From Swiss-Prot:
This is Pyridoxine/pyridoxamine 5'-phosphate oxidase. One of its GO terms (biological process) is pyridoxal phosphate biosynthetic process. The keyword Nucleotide-binding does not apply. Substrate binds at residues 7-10, 65, 122, 126, 130, 189-191. Catalyzes the oxidation of either pyridoxine 5'-phosphate (PNP) or pyridoxamine 5'-phosphate (PMP) into pyridoxal 5'-phosphate (PLP).
Length: 210
């Protein structure tokens, strides 16, 4: 299957280094708000890449649940494959892609577990069925069939008909950024790339060649 004729010309926006915020968190928050306002499909979806003990990379999509001055927060099963990778090597890479805006954001940094009480607080806001699912799913483990998963979920629901506590193996990670790159598509593949990199306690902002 040949795909070399599938291409778009990027013409919608410009990213000026002069107009960027002094720190990447503020710049990201601005772009995130614009993605939500533009009704981008899944504006909080991000790819997270990790490396296992053999040095082999793997990636998957997760949802961003919070941005604060420290970094980017997502939640998962700590016993999942991604959790095991992070336990072995906490350095991860995040990528957001908003095609409707011809934009991409790449983040590299260290993932650290957030305090249990913060995970408890978020877990309590999840729909009941999602909380049941956190108990029923041994994420990344091989299962015999889908019916067995539903059966386990039913057992959990019977045990917790009202309040579902957070499993100890489920919680949040904070990705503390070391570099953040904002990419804006431009004509002729001469794209805008503005990178922020942490140096001591300061953010250095620089333009990269596309």
């Amino acid at each position: 299957m040949e795909l070399h004729n599938i291409r778009d010309e990027y013409t919608k926006r410009v990213l000026s280094q002069h107009d960027c915020h002094e720190n990447p968190i503020s710049q990201f928050e601005q772009w995130q708000k614009e993605a939500i306002h533009a009704q981008v499909n899944e504006p909080t979806a991000m790819n997270i890449a990790t490396v296992d003990e053999q040095g082999r990379p793997n990636s998957r999509m997760v949802l961003l649940k919070e941005v604060n001055e420290q970094g980017f927060v997502f939640f998962t099963n700590y016993l999942s494959r991604k959790g095991g990778c992070i336990e072995h090597n906490p350095y991860v890479a995040l990528t957001f892609f908003w095609p409707e805006l011809e934009r991409q954001v790449r983040i590299e940094g260290k993932a650290v577990k957030i305090p249990a009480e913060q995970s408890d607080k978020y877990f309590a806001t999840r729909p009941y069925t999602s909380r049941i699912g956190a108990w029923a799913s041994e994420q990344s483990a091989v299962i015999s069939n889908y019916k067995s998963l539903l059966a386990k979920a039913a057992l959990v629901a019977a045990k917790h008909p009202l309040n579902v506590p957070r499993p100890d193996y489920w919680g949040g990670y904070l990705v503390v950024p070391e570099t953040v790159e904002f990419w804006q598509g431009r004509p002729s593949r001469l794209h805008d790339r503005i990178r922020y990199r942490k140096e001591s306690d300061n953010w250095i902002r620089e333009r990269l060649s596309p």
